[in-house]
């Protein structure tokens, strides 16, 4: 069954421009307070100019282009401009450092990069020291370094016509994006997302929050994450609504932005809710038009009730991951909600709780949350150039193993129990314990290392490192944290260090993480 009517992203934007014309499609607010607005017609023209820019730089169907950007209009232009010519977006987490960014460049096979001046020195170093296929860089800032192979994105874009010059044949099965996501292995995996995936995500997420064309969907979530792209942007655009993209989250500014743009839908993670609750109470706390607050794990009942009562909102719980594209389990429009349930399986999906032998479990028993969808349509297609990893989580008949544990009740409501093995959830970011352990193990004074997540009142979990030193060595906290800051993204740097004589292990030699907190 073709739910999206065979419509790829190029056709979507041409149709949206025709149908909604001068209606506001996108509002972007920078951290400095600069606001840019685009109608559906204007946004489609900017997307076409960007597509033409890429074509003039030699980008063709199937080529990969990396984006290392904070939330900005250029991210939207590039995302859909690439899709219009059949090229593939590779978004890079804007918080990543040199080694991590270089690894994604190498393993995505990206040949062009769009970034800003603040990240340019890092990529200049990557070009000099790492083997990549990168042959050109576009900077979104006006000022340009005097280097070959570097262009001004804005200047080149503004020289292009507003009609598309290169329109190769497209299929909804074509890859639109490769999104690298943290896994339980030492390196992230590239989640392959098709035109169909993104079109379906728009319709599905719009259904989930009953979105209409008079809605305003505001998000502060980073554009390089799946939730911003599929739960927010694709939903808003698919419904002809207005999408408000704020560059960075500020607890002090958030409610003012909600009120200023008359937002009717927004999304929050627990860190946001906790930081909003510590702001001074205001008579304007409930002066807004919010109908739904899309919410993602994990919050206590007391925190949830206090937030909803103070701000006069209700939470729409949604559970998913990059591989599921959308929140495949969640609350439904017009349906009852059962906190702390994460909801019920959405349309086009099946969900089961399975035991260690991959057998379905009855209601009330804890096991692995498994989801059935259609690869490349309602769930991800595959991991890029990694068939072994794909086969490990995705069965031939479409059952996806999430690695998360939970249970369901007799009415089909699901409940989340625990995170995937060896993953830490920190302020909306997934952090791989194995990745951090491999980095820290390179320190010459460290013999053994394990990192775990511990409860944090603001950011869900903090990162704690337990280390065993080589005989005769000493290691100060200052030296340890400086090493971490130099070798990993800021959000991955542990908050706590404990030096031990040994680490607890079971009879097979595996570290017993539950004994370390």
From Swiss-Prot:
Reaction it catalyzes: 4-(trimethylamino)butanoate + ATP + CoA = 4-(trimethylamino)butanoyl-CoA + AMP + diphosphate; crotonobetaine + ATP + CoA = crotonobetainyl-CoA + AMP + diphosphate; (R)-carnitine + ATP + CoA = (R)-carnitinyl-CoA + AMP + diphosphate
Pfam families: AMP-binding, AMP-binding_C
Chain's role: Catalyzes the transfer of CoA to carnitine, generating the initial carnitinyl-CoA needed for the CaiB reaction cycle. Also has activity toward crotonobetaine and gamma-butyrobetaine.
Gene: caiC
Organism (species): Escherichia coli O7:K1 (strain IAI39 / ExPEC)
GO molecular function, one term: medium-chain fatty acid-CoA ligase activity
EC number of this enzyme: 6.2.1.48
Entry protein name: Crotonobetaine/carnitine--CoA ligase
Protein's UniProt keywords contain Ligase: yes
InterPro entries found in the cross-reference section: AMP-bd_C (IPR025110), AMP-bd_C_sf (IPR045851), AMP-binding_CS (IPR020845), AMP-dep_synth/lig_dom (IPR000873), ANL_N_sf (IPR042099), CaiC (IPR023456)
The protein's annotated pathway: Amine and polyamine metabolism; carnitine metabolism
Cited Gene3D superfamilies: 3.30.300.30, N-terminal domain of ligase-like
Any one of the GO BP annotations: carnitine metabolic process
Keywords recorded for this protein, A-Z: Ligase
Family from the record: Belongs to the ATP-dependent AMP-binding enzyme family.
């Amino acid at each position: 069954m073709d739910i999206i009517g065979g419509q790829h992203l190029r056709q979507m934007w041409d149709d949206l421009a025709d149908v909604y014309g001068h209606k506001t499609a996108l509002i972007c607010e920078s951290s400095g307070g600069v606001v840019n607005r685009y109608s559906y017609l204007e946004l489609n023209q900017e997307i076409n100019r960007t597509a033409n820019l890429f074509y003039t730089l030699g980008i063709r169907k199937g080529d990969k282009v990396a984006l290392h950007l904070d939330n900005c209009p250029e991210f939207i232009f590039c995302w859909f401009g690439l899709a219009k010519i059949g090229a593939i977006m590779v978004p890079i987490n804007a918080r990543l450092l040199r080694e991590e960014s270089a690894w994604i460049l190498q393993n995505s096979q990206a040949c062009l990069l769009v970034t800003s001046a603040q990240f340019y020195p890092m990529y200049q170093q990557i070009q000099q020291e790492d083997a990549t296929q990168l042959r050109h860089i576009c900077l979104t800032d006006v000022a340009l370094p005097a280097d070959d192979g570097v262009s001004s994105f804005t200047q080149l874009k503004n020289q292009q016509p507003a009609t598309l010059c290169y329109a190769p044949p497209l299929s909804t099965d074509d890859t639109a994006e490769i999104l690298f996501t943290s896994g339980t292995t030492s390196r992230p995996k590239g989640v392959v997302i098709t035109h169909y995936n993104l079109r379906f995500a728009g319709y599905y997420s719009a259904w989930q929050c009953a979105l209409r064309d008079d809605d305003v969907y505001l998000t502060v979530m980073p554009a390089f994450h799946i939730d911003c792209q599929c739960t927010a942007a694709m939903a808003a655009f698919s419904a002809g609504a207005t999408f408000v993209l704020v560059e960075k989250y500020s607890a002090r500014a958030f409610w003012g932005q909600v009120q200023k743009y008359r937002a009717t839908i927004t999304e929050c993670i627990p860190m946001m809710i906790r930081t909003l609750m510590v702001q001074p109470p205001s008579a304007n706390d409930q002066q807004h038009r919010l109908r739904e607050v899309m919410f993602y794990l994990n919050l206590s009942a007391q925190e949830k009730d206090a937030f909803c009562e103070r701000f006069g909102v209700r939470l729409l719980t949604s559970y998913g991951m990059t591989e599921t594209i959308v929140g495949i389990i969640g609350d439904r429009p017009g349906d009852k909600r059962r906190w702390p349930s994460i909801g019920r399986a959405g349309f086009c999906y099946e969900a089961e709780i399975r035991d260690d032998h991959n057998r379905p479990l009855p209601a009330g028993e804890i096991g692995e949350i498994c989801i059935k969808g259609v690869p490349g349509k309602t769930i991800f297609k595959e991991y890029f150039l990694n068939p072994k990893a794909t086969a490990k989580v995705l069965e031939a008949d479409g059952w996806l193993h999430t690695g998360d544990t939970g249970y369901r009740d007799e009415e089909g409501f699901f409940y989340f129990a625990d995170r995937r093995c060896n993953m830490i959830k920190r302020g909306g970011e997934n952090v791989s314990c194995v990745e951090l352990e491999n980095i820290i193990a390179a320190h010459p004074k460290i013999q053994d290392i394990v990192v775990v997540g511990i409860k944090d009142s603001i950011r869900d979990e903090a990162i704690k490192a337990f280390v065993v030193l080589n005989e005769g060595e000493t290691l100060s906290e200052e030296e340890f944290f400086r090493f971490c800051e130099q070798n990993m993204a800021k959000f991955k740097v542990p908050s706590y260090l404990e030096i031990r004589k040994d680490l607890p292990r079971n009879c097979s030699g595996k570290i017993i993480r539950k004994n370390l907190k």
